[in-house]
Structure formats: C-alpha cells, structure tokens
C-alpha cells in the first residue's frame, strides 16, 4: 500500500513512510521538550508524564491528519465528484475529463488506494510510540 503506483508519474509514492517518520520525529521532539521543561525532580515521573503527553499530542495530530485527508479532494476524487455532478445536473460546465468507463474504474478503486494510508500511519506511529516509551523508561 505504501508503494502504490501513481498513473500520472509512474513513480512509487513514499508519502506514508515520510509522514510516519515525521510523526516519530515529532514524538521524540515533544518528548524532549516536555522533559526539558518539567519542574519535578523525580525522573521516572517526568519521563512517564512526558511520554503520555507526547503520545496524546501525536495521536491527536494523526487523527487530524486522517480527517484532513478524507475531507480534501485530490485529482481522482475531484474528477469523480465532477462526474457525479455531471450525471445529476447534466451541466456542460461540470463535464469531467474522463470517460464513463474510467469513472467507474476510478470510483471503484479509489477507496482501496487511499484506505491504507490512515491505518498504516496510525500503526507505525503506535509501534514507534511504544518502542520509544519503553526505551525512555529503561
């Protein structure tokens, strides 16, 4: 799913890996910042609170990114919505750039192509958070 081929560029898309690495780096950054600014002298309490803070901040960002991705229109979704408007309204202005067969193919495979992105990032983030939390507690 990460190495999904794009018809326009014929290159592998590595967006999922890049975003997952970004979230892992962000996790460690927030972890270090919260440890640095914590006022307590008990190191284990500081680390536990920092891991929890970093985990929930990143989890919120992952959720927001997933919602944002579902709400935005990339090229394929835009063409599908144009075709739906064209079929409903019969408007010349909404006439899509794809044929009806292409529309059927794209609308049938669109969810399959984009559904793994959100879950893959979440799983990689959770595994990375677990590993970094365990390492920081040692």
Curated annotation (Swiss-Prot):
Keyword check for Transmembrane: yes
TM spans (from-to): 17-37, 43-63, 117-137
Protein origin, superkingdom: Bacteria
N-terminal signal peptide: none
Disulfide bond sites: none
GO CC terms: plasma membrane
Membrane topology: Multi-pass membrane protein
UniProt-annotated location(s): Cell membrane
Main location: membrane
Keywords linked to the UniProt accession: Cell membrane, Membrane, Transmembrane, Transmembrane helix
Keyword NAD: no
Name of the protein in question: Uncharacterized protein MG076
